[in-house]
Structure formats: C-alpha cells, structure tokens
Amino acid sequence: MVICGMEKPYIVDQKFEKESTLAMGEYEHCIFKNCQFESEDFKNFQFVDCTFESCNLSLVKLSGASLQKVHFKDCKMQGLRFEACNPFLFEVSFDTCVLNLSSFYQIKGKKTKFAGCSLHEVDFTEADFSEAVFDDCDLAGALFDQTNVSKADFRSAFNFVIHPSINQIKKAKFSPDGLAGLLQGFGITIG
C-alpha cells in the first residue's frame, strides 16, 4: 500500500527487488532484496520493521534517516556513518554483513545483535552497546574508546582489542581465547 499526501509517501508491506534507487519516503514492513543502493542518499528516509537482504548499501548517506527495528542480512555496508541517523527509536540488527570502516560513534545500540559480521576498523567510540551480541564477528582494528559494552557477549567474537581501563566491560562475556584482546593494551604477552 502506498499513501501519498503533502508529506513524503508512506509505503507499507511492499517488496523491492534489484532496485538501484528509492524514492524518499516512510517505509514500514518492507523487504529490500538484491538491491544496489551504493552511495545513495537516504537523507530523512524512515524505515520501520524493514529487512534488507543481499543488498549493497556501502557509502549510503544516512543523514537524518530513521532506522527502527531494521534487520540487515547478507548485506555489504562499508563506510556507513550510523551516528548521522535520527537517534529516536534507533534499533538495528545484522546477520552476515560486511560493515568494515563504518562508524557507530556515540550510538545507543543497547542489545544490538551482530551475527557472523565483518567489523574491520569499525568505530564504536563513546557508544553504548551494553548487552549487545557479537556472535562469530571479526573485529580486527575495531575501535572501542569510552564504549559501554557491559553485559555484551564476545564469546565467539575474534580479533578484538578492548582496553578495560577506558571502556565499561562489567559483566561482559568473553571466551578464554579472547582474553588476549583485553590484555593487549597493557603490554602483556600471552603464550
């Protein structure tokens, strides 16, 4: 259903396949599959309860975009600046996505789920990812600085370096294999 009026269009329960452009609007309960949105401008778009599957969203401009309960699966999403999004009801989840070089600076991402994701050099500075799950995620070069990851689950994550002295990690879960990533900042050699 598409409702048009004086404001931007309101699109509900639609499926978009192999699209390369998207009209600015409010999208609710929509599915985007195999779309090529690389470098598109999603300024002030609104996505509520939407799913992006096998899409290329690299370098998409997110200024003022609203992402509310949006799930990304098998998507390429390099270089995104999530801090440019509207923070109101921001909620996202990621399943086997490539988010390399993206930024979550100061994002409130409590309970966010990352599963099987590549998070190389992602910036989590001053963000709140408490109770987040990093399941089988590669965090090589990811930056955690003044980040709240208390109660987060890193048990199957790898290649991370999180300095306990500058981040909140109380009750976070780590595997014995991940302990080196917590001690690296102290100049300690393990093994």
Model-derived regions, located:
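Tandem repeat scaffolds
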Residues: V2-G191
